[in-house]
A protein has these predicted regions:
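Macromolecular interaction modules
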Residues: 1-213
Length: 213
């Protein structure tokens, strides 16, 4: 399973309510007529993207929230289909309404590394319930193979999933652990700061689900 993740925030002068409604309309459109290979989509409000969506001082002064989209896909072929379908017949109007209100944005592509799936291929831990994301990144030149296998230590696959970046499409971190927790103190041992090598970082972001379907 792959996940295309997109971080974005409103263009200067665009109200958050109007922006959210436009984004929700696009997600509803995809759910109504789902492209082949697209399993689920999710939209979250986040306080800030820790790898920085560069915005003007005016936008920052608005204290406008940032947003995080997840598009769960079967494979790379499904990613290509979504890319075409999003601006194709049936979705073009909703896509363009959302896009024209958007300001800064950045994307990343991740593959499921650890996490249970049902017989139908769905995640056992629903993406929409993951209200905490822990982003783990390494310094340039550092090896990650062995550590990547340990990040899931202590993770309950029924309530969490571990994702690993596939392509460098932007500033997104190397790994993402999604957990259904209300407190960062309950984070799995594998991503505890005391276990990470020097230079590695673990950034915790709280998320509020606006859409999952």
């Amino acid at each position: 399973m792959l996940a295309y993740v997109f971080w974005h925030r409103p263009r200067e002068g665009v109200a958050s309510d109007a922006y959210e409604q436009a984004q929700l309309s696009f997600h509803r459109s995809l759910a109504h007529s789902r492209p082949t290979g697209l399993r689920r989509t999710a939209l979250f409000e986040i306080d800030e993207s820790p790898w920085a969506l560069h915005v003007s001082d005016a936008v920052r002064a608005q204290a406008a929230p940032a947003y995080e989209d997840w598009y769960l896909l079967d494979d790379f072929t499904s990613l290509g289909i979504l890319n075409e379908a999003a601006v194709g017949h049936g979705h073009r109007t909703a896509h363009d309404e959302a896009a024209r209100r958007a300001g800064a944005g950045a994307g990343g592509l991740y593959a499921l590394s650890e996490g249970s799936r049902s017989g139908s291929g769905e995640l056992a831990a629903p993406l929409g319930d993951a209200n905490v994301a822990i982003w783990v990144d390494r310094p340039l030149g550092a090896s990650h193979t062995a550590l990547g296998e340990l990040l899931g230590d202590g993770m309950d696959p029924r309530n969490a999933s571990l994702w690993r970046r596939q392509l460098v499409l932007g500033p997104a971190p190397e790994f993402c652990l999604l957990v259904r927790e209300s407190s960062v103190f309950d984070e799995p041992a594998g991503v505890a700061r005391t276990r990470l090598p020097d230079g590695w970082t673990a950034t915790v972001t709280a998320r509020r689900a606006l859409w999952y379907g």
